Amino acid sequence: MTHRRTKLFMMAAVVSYVMTSCGAVPINDLLDRASQRSDQLHSLSTTLSQELDSHFPPIGRVIMPRPSMCHTSALQTPNDKTQALQVSESELLSLARSLLQAWADPLSALSSSAFSLPHPAQSSIFNKVREMQEHSKNLGDGLDILSGKMGEAAQALSSLPFRGNDVGQDRISKLINFHFLLSCFRRDSHKIDSFLKVLRCRAANTQPEMC
């Protein structure tokens, strides 16, 4: 019993140290790290899309759902940098966190589907999806810390439920639905990256036209 209490005390001390250390990091540095991670995440999704394109059936481009069908499309977000610069810092962070959180289940669905995806680069695709999951989680943890420093508005989250766990049964359906889901993630990862870059720019007191 004494050993167990000692172990629990040590774990609590480690958690306390980590939280204190994170709390001591300036917002500018946290935004730099978050921006770097979001850039890596978007770059990875782009590379994965290109890899998937190498053996994507032509019919797939014709019947693939439109971007407006992405499960995150209901969230109203700035369409470009000019609009993003008009949104408050707290709201931008809230939007980035909402988008990222909305991809926890879809990324799991992509990971499960990639395990048996009918594609010559299946193994590479599977590994990249797992890597995206890891990057997404790490980024989410960082944004949670940031939101705690930026007030209640930054901590607000919009619910964007995902109901498409089954990507299909036949080869064509699997490839098309996988590609569609990945294209949605690539679009959203670009938004997240853009929002965080605007936040980083503002934190550095850079002139808006230079962001």
Swiss-Prot record:
InterPro entries: 4_helix_cytokine-like_core, Somatotropin/Prolactin, Somatotropin_CS. Residues 1-24 form the signal peptide. GO terms for molecular function: hormone activity. Disulfide bonds join 70-184, 201-211. It holds the Pfam family Hormone_1. It is found in: Secreted. GO terms for biological process: positive regulation of cell population proliferation; positive regulation of receptor signaling pathway via JAK-STAT; response to nutrient levels. Keywords: Disulfide bond, Hormone, Secreted, Signal. One of its GO terms (cellular component) is extracellular space. PANTHER family: PROLACTIN, SOMATOTROPIN,PROLACTIN. Belongs to the somatotropin/prolactin family. This is Prolactin. It comes from Paralichthys olivaceus (Bastard halibut).
